[in-house]
Structures are given as structure tokens and as C-alpha cells.
Amino acid sequence: SPMYVEKFNVLQHPKYTEKLCKELAERFRDQNVELVIGPMTGGILLAHEVGKALGTRAIFTEREKGVMTLRRGFKIEPGTRVLIVEDIVTTGGSVQEVVNVVNQSGGEIVGVGLLVNRSGGKAEFGVPHEKVQALLNLEVPTYKPEECPLCKDGIAMTERGSKHIK
């Protein structure tokens, strides 16, 4: 991808994180959310702040042996109205994993809230598009290594940021 979005430039500031999460929460206020869930790492902060704004419980998923799961005694009771939150979506893979966890638990997904959707709305995770809200929508191309123009030019993307690109 020719663009990198560093979420922690914003998330390091609690007042901005709170403001963004309140805006995200407002978009789902009428959905009677009972639980907010996000994937580790950035999703933990978002779930907490959105849950606080909605007055609900907030939990997170994490990988165990490569599989996204609920740990630490977290549970989703069948029928619980769940809002999934994530910081940045490129392919939708992490959100899809959280969707799977919620579905396996019998929860009802009422929405997916994103800070940034880099897929231009193309990421699919089994949730109807009308239930997905992003504060910022971008259309950023994502390449397989063999198709990447930077890779073809010999520019190794091994570090975050763009300081090594000339």
C-alpha cells in the first residue's frame, strides 16, 4: 500500500480518542447496544471508550495460537446485542475474526464501528454494509507482494512510516 495510517498518533491523546469514540458511539446509540467488543490492540481502547459513551460493558478478543478468541473470562451470552469496533480496516481480516467469535457465541451483531476504513468500502466481513459506520473512509490500494510497485522498485517496506522512501 502506498499509504500508512498510524492510529497511535491519535490514540496516544486520551481527549481525542474520547471525542472520536463518542462520535462512533452516537452512530449506534439507537441500536440498544449491550456489549462493545474490539480486537487487541487498538480495539481495546476503542471498545472501552465507546462502551463508556454508551454505558455498556466492553471486552476484547485476542489471538491464542493464531486464532482470535475470548480469554480472561470474557463471555458473550446468546442474544446479546453486540457492537464491534476497530481502529483501521484494510482487508477486514481482524473484524471478520471478531465477527466469527461473536457469531460462535450466539451474539447479535448490531453494527461495526471503524475509525478508518481504508478499503473504500470493499472490505467484507459478513455484516451488511448499512450496519458499518466509519468516521473516515479512504480508498487506498492494497497490493500482493508480487504486484506492489514499491517492491518492484526495490523499496523494502520493513519499517513503519515513510522516512526511508526517497
Regions found by a protein language model. Give the residues of each.
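PRPP-associated nucleotide enzymes
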Residues: S1-K166
